[in-house]
Regions:
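Long, well-ordered mid-to-C-terminal structural blocks that present hydrophobic/aromatic surfaces
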Residues: 225, 229-279
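C-terminal regulatory/interaction regions
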Residues: 1-3, 8-12, 247, 252-263, ...
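Active-site catalytic pocket residues across diverse enzymes, especially alpha/beta-hydrolases
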Residues: 18-20, 56, 82-86, 253-257, ...
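Active-site environment of divalent metal-dependent phosphoester hydrolases
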Residues: 10-12, 33-36, 70-75, 102-104, ...
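Flexible, acidic/histidine-containing loops and adjacent segments that form or flank the divalent-metal
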Residues: 85-237, 320, 325-326, 336-354
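Active-site metal-binding motif and surrounding structural segment of the metallo-beta-lactamase
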Residues: 43-96, 259-278, 287-291
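Conserved beta-strand hairpin/beta-sheet module of binuclear metal-dependent hydrolase folds
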Residues: 1-57, 221-247
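C-terminal functional module detector
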Residues: 167, 173, 200, 211-215, ...
Length: 354
């Protein structure tokens, strides 16, 4: 199995490729910002378009497209692909997408207009006139979405792999519908505020080891609705956390029998919410055992990752290997004192083979 970590701005986009014993398979998790596919201002194509063009030329498809949640830094690259490529749907065989309408139907609640995702496609390629439609209507019309809710506790087999869903819970979906209208945009709930990179790792660890330190969890209802999961291929396990909240993930891991004495062992953990300090806590790091921690962001927008998060990881696992997809983040977040105090392994990783 090969996992490619696409440069997705301050967002997420991962391409997983493997052979199921019969044919090559591809799973795409999120699409990053719109520039991940194509930047109209710079007239340059991003990693997502490069990878999709390669698959298309090779006669391969996206067997499963997972949209973890509807934040711009996860969905806009996908929307740009469907907007600019009128044959994009032909490459996609199946989609996981908890749309606002689907969640409302599942919960038998009124739909929230603010949760709709719009899509503009060329209705006439000669005139360049765009037609505005709902993204979910497009997916239904092209018959690539079965409208199945993806929710905590499900165990799904796709293309020779097993996926254990950790979030969202039904409670988190209810919160999304009931609270989102008052928090449209969610900027106050997701922003990383100023960078904390000036502070030493050692200082963070000493501060958090004090008995009176309290963890403050992310309050974004959109992030809480993220599809997070354990992916298993043969004897390899991978943890993809989207922008999920740690408490809900921990609760589900415990329900599956994992704890600090019987941790979930994975080959890779995609750190939640681009390394935000509000999405990874000590308890989660005790329940999940791995060497490889991947953080996807260029640090624009919300100033992620928080160095405090990396300090928590180092405190829990001094042998941690950090994987970044932007060199300036890898180079700037650790200072000389950090490297003197700890043996830090930080890499720029475009892909990993397992």
């Amino acid at each position: 199995m090969k996992i490619k970590f696409l440069q997705a701005g301050n967002g997420d986009s991962f391409l997983i490729s493997f052979n199921d014993g019969k044919q090559n398979r591809n799973i795409l998790i999120d699409g990053g910002t719109s520039e991940t596919y194509y930047s109209q201002n710079a007239n340059t194509q991003g990693d997502l378009k490069t990878e999709l063009d390669y698959l298309k030329d090779s006669g391969e498809t996206i067997d499963l497209l997972i949209l973890t949640h509807i934040d711009n830094d996860h969905i806009c690259g996908l929307l740009k692909w469907f907007e600019l490529d009128d044959k994009a749907y032909e490459m996609v065989k199946n989609v996981w997408f908890n749309s606002g309408k689907l969640i409302a139907t599942y919960l038998n609640e009124p739909e929230i207009e603010d949760l709709r995702v719009g899509l503009k496609i060329f209705s006439d390629t000669k005139t360049g006139v765009h037609e505005a439609i709902d993204f979910e209507d497009y997916l239904i019309d092209k018959d690539i979405w079965n409208k199945k809710i993806i929710i905590q506790g499900q165990k799904i087999e796709e293309c020779g792999i097993k996926i254990q869903i950790l979030s969202p819970s039904e409670e988190q979906l209810i919160r999304l519908l009931k609270e989102y209208k008052d928090k449209t945009g969610d900027s106050a709930y997701t922003a990383g505020k100023g960078k904390d990179w000036h502070k030493n790792i050692k200082d963070f660890i000493e501060e958090e080891n004090k008995s009176d330190f309290k963890f403050s969890q992310d309050r974004s209802v959109k992030n809480g609705s993220s599809i997070s999961f354990i992916m298993t291929f043969k004897d390899k396990h991978f943890l993809f956390l989207g922008d999920s909240h740690p408490k809900g993930v921990i609760k589900q891991l415990k329900a599956l029998g994992y704890n600090k004495d019987n941790p979930l062992e994975v080959n890779l953990m995609k750190v939640s919410h681009h390394g935000s300090k509000a999405n990874t806590n000590k308890e989660l790091l005790k329940i999940v055992k791995t060497e490889n921690y991947f953080i996807s962001t260029d640090s624009s927008g919300h100033n992620h990752p928080n160095k405090r998060t990396l300090a928590r990881i180092i405190n829990a696992n001094p042998k941690a290997i950090f994987h970044f997809n932007y060199e300036h983040v890898r180079n700037d977040i650790f200072n000389p004192q950090d490297r003197q105090d700890f043996y830090i392994k930080a890499r720029i990783t475009k892909e990993l083979d397992f």
